[in-house]
């Protein structure tokens, strides 16, 4: 951080606004928004960061800021600045091309075309189709059924398409404008999903052709009917109300975000758009930036409704999109948003799985890690993590990676037995003693490397038990996290030292996966244990609430907190009699009355080791 930046940091206001980071050439490399400019901009130059943020900060030599009246103004300004300057570190959509649409032109003799430009020219537009191949497939089918004009300028004689029955040859055609408008309406109905009439017409024509012994023409009609059927199967029915809507869902993990947009037209999912990119700020804020870019830079018609996840600022989206914005609580629309979120998670998991499944990279990472630590190649790595909240239900977990891949059959869970209160060192001592005491007693194969989730204190505890008490010779390393609970540095050696390990390396990525998996496994076990203990104790003694109903409540609401927040009606919906539901509310809310009959549904999407903001 240079002196110029230090001086400017002291002048930052606490107002909302936008900040602009520049490199040594004065080029804008990142634009961001903040509710509090002072806190946000200073955060870049304090503490440690993940790899991608460190890369950004290393290039910043100057910054500017613009104060706005509100957060929404800051959001709109940020989108405009990104659009104008195209900073390399900002969220950018896949390309600057617009999505293709199928268009019926507003001409005396209309044409059916593919276009990426939506204009107010009286034409009928259908789409968007992120997959241009799908748009072309539909157009080819329509060309075979409806003989629209193909030529931009009237030819002097009939064209090739006239001879194959795909053009009316309007220069010699005797049909009036009403005929073509009627045909345009049929296409419109077809693209809106009302294709039964067209199929009936084709079936009638096929029957007439067969009776007239025109078998080739009958076969052509048959093929068209089959093609429409195939197209139907590709367009899944998602909603019964036949509305046009865009459905947004997103998922974040390991500094990456995936946003999926489902295009639902006339109740059918016709296409989806998928984007994966690194994010630098709060995921909710970066998602809003994405939505703004999506509707400003992707030239397509805004639908009747836009569905967004629960945690997103509805008013901010309304400022970006001139449409009805909904955050569905339940039912069909809620399922659509959940489906978009699920697909975003799957896409992001696939991205990381592809990296994990790269055998050469993983094997190379293991070998390089061994060379870096000056130990034999650590084929088997065992890693430990503790979990407790204020000392309650303390647990520990061990995960095992063999050849760089999780060996889940070897995972182990430990309830802490000898420690009272939140003592991480004592818990680590107990678990290490139990695990490797058993390895020694039963002559089990020891690991090639032990990785402890923690710093110098935890690693030294493990060394005392393994080397001094048990007399085992097993290398032990520590993975220390930063204040954001992200893998930060590797500790190893005697005495312990920070290992010079690039955060962009496959070795670091492997260790990060191991640490994340140990944390996920430990916290999952802890939550299960804590939930079981709390759930059983607080719901015991309620007449009419047996084990089966308790299980159903837990399965539906996921946690005791959610049951406590639920209304009586919502509890009844799970199959609990009203009198019992009222008793549950009285037991869980002893200082007040049962919650209102209609309450807002809340869903917690936070999962172990990941940030999943719907």
Swiss-Prot record:
Chief location bin: cytoplasm
Domain of life from the UniProt record: Bacteria
InterPro entries from the UniProt entry: GIY-YIG_endonuc, GIY-YIG_endonuc_sf, GIY-YIG_UvrC_Cho, RuvA_2-like, UVR_dom, UVR_dom_sf, UvrABC_protein_C, UvrC
One cellular-component annotation, GO: cytoplasm
GO biological process: nucleotide-excision repair; SOS response
Self-association state and partner proteins as the record states: Interacts with UvrB in an incision complex.
Record family assignment: Belongs to the UvrC family.
Function: The UvrABC repair system catalyzes the recognition and processing of DNA lesions. UvrC both incises the 5' and 3' sides of the lesion. The N-terminal half is responsible for the 3' incision and the C-terminal half is responsible for the 5' incision.
Name listed for the protein in its UniProt record: UvrABC system protein C
